[in-house]
């Protein structure tokens, strides 16, 4: 059995729900269970979530092999434990406070920046990207012979979180140690270091996203998800030639947000 949700029509005259409706009810129940566990920290496996975070840097394929195992044992691709999301949120809060400190922001400015980053950059943009990728993958990437299967929205969101974590660590943590004394010095070395960190971070996001969708056996042509590497490398080269410092732009944007 392919690890996905079957959507074959099984409508009967006796009023029994077809498989599509049943899948929706099942998805709703799983979503409710996931949200309920957000407030039950003792039920979360933080050790396993931390292990996943480590392997997203060293061997992201191993993380997606665990998604296969979850599908076989719990009949769903998406995580049923919000521990990863909780740890990611903690990382995001701590690193954003660090950004506020490095940019010499006051207490209330840092809190305002934190709300912007968490609610808009992480949650809002994350929901938008997950929904877009969920639609594209189901609309254009499902194999013709596998039309009875679809990508779970929760899985699309998990793929985004997986890809977002390395980007967060590189741009919101590692970069902090270089901002004031290297990156923002308005020199070639400054924007070389800063823009290279951006190249690695965004490249990681693209690659981990590709791995997430290529792990689904009922999808085709997932290699197209690697195509953004071409404009990314082109943009990187142009930025060095034109002296465009991505991190300087980000810092200016953050300061503008909290005015």
UniProtKB/Swiss-Prot annotation:
Lumenal side: 104-115, 185-187, 244-259
Molecular function, one GO term: RNA binding
N-acetylmethionine modifications at: 1
Tissue expression summary: Present in periodontal ligament fibroblasts (at protein level).
Membrane topology: Multi-pass membrane protein
Transmembrane parts of this sequence: 83-103, 116-136, 164-184, 188-208, 223-243
Cellular component aspect of the GO annotation: Golgi membrane; nuclear inner membrane
Keyword entries, A-Z: Acetylation, Golgi apparatus, Membrane, Nucleus, Phosphoprotein, RNA-binding, Transmembrane, Transmembrane helix
Cytoplasmic topological intervals: 1-82, 137-163, 209-222
GO terms, biological process: protein localization to cell surface
Alphabetical list of Pfam families matching this protein: UNC-50
Subcellular location: Nucleus inner membrane; Golgi apparatus membrane
Phosphoserine: residues bearing it: 6
Record-stated family: Belongs to the unc-50 family.
Task performed by this protein: Involved in the cell surface expression of neuronal nicotinic receptors. Binds RNA.
Protein name: Protein unc-50 homolog
Organism of origin: Homo sapiens (Human)
Taxonomic path: Eukaryota, Metazoa, Chordata, Craniata, Vertebrata
Underlying gene: UNC50
């Amino acid at each position: 059995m392919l690890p996905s949700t079957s959507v074959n029509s099984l409508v009967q005259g006796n009023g029994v729900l077809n498989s599509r409706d049943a899948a929706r009810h099942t998805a709703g129940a799983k979503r409710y269970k996931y949200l309920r566990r957000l407030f039950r920290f003792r039920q979360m496996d933080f050790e396993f979530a931390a292990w996943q975070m480590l392997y997203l840097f060293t061997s992201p394929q191993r993380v997606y092999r665990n998604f296969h195992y979850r599908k076989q044992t719990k009949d769903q691709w998406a995580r049923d434990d919000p521990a990863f999301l909780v740890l990611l949120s903690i990382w995001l809060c701590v690193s954003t406070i660090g950004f506020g400190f490095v940019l010499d922001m006051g207490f209330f400015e840092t809190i305002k920046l934190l709300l912007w980053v968490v609610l808009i950059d992480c949650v809002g943009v994350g929901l938008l990207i997950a929904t877009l990728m969920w639609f594209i993958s189901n609309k254009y990437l499902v194999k013709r012979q596998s039309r009875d299967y679809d990508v779970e929205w929760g899985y699309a969101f998990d793929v985004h979180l997986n890809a977002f974590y390395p980007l967060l660590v590189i741009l919101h943590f590692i970069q902090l140690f270089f901002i004031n004394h290297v990156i923002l010095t308005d020199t070639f070395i400054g924007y070389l270091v800063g823009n290279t960190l951006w190249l690695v971070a965004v490249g990681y996001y693209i690659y981990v996203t590709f791995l997430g969708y290529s792990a689904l056996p009922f999808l085709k042509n997932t290699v197209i998800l690697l195509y953004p590497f071409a404009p990314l490398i082109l943009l990187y080269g142009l930025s060095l030639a034109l002296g465009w410092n991505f991190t300087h732009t980000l810092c200016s944007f953050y300061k503008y947000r909290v005015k």
